Amino acid sequence: LIYAKVECLTTGVRTYVGKQSWPELVGTKGKTAAATIDKENTHVTAVLCPPLTTLAACRTFDFRCDRVRVLINRIGGVVTKTPTVG
């Protein structure tokens, strides 16, 4: 398990403890993974990101401490990469 003490604020950094990475979810269904992430770290929101999506949260390069991108494949919606905060 990977834990970090980071919370983004517009004026600086505050700390909290929460899970930041979910390698065990690679190969699972995206919706199941998103629900697990939301349950295990209430400070973040999981966003499903299929290939070639136009969803803004999936296409930006900004780092956000309250978002976890869940990259899924087109066939079956299976998680293809370790979901991490950012």
Swiss-Prot record:
Summarize what the entry records about the temperature dependence of activity: Active between 10 and 60 degrees Celsius. 84% activity retained when heated for 30 minutes at 80 degrees Celsius. Incubation at temperatures above 80 degrees Celsius rapidly decreases inhibitory activity.
Q: What are the GO MF terms of this UniProt record?
A: serine-type endopeptidase inhibitor activity
pH sensitivity of activity? Optimum pH is 8.0 at 37 degrees Celsius. Maintains over 90% of its inhibitory activity from pH 3 to 10.
Keywords of this entry? Antimicrobial, Disulfide bond, Fungicide, Plant defense, Protease inhibitor, Serine protease inhibitor
The record's Pfam families line, in alphabetical order, gives:
potato_inhibit
Which positions are tagged coiled coil? none
Q: Name one GO biological process term.
A: response to wounding
Which residues are tagged with the site Reactive bond?
A: F61, D62
The disulfide bridges present are: C8-C65, C49-C58
> What top-level branch of life does the organism fall under?
Eukaryota
| Family the UniProt entry places it in | Belongs to the protease inhibitor I13 (potato type I serine protease inhibitor) family.
Q: What does this protein do?
A: Serine protease inhibitor which is active against trypsin. Displays strong antifungal activity against a number of phytopathogenic fungi including M.melonis, A.cucumerina, A.solani, C.glaeosporioides and P.capsici.
Q: What is this protein called?
A: Trypsin inhibitor
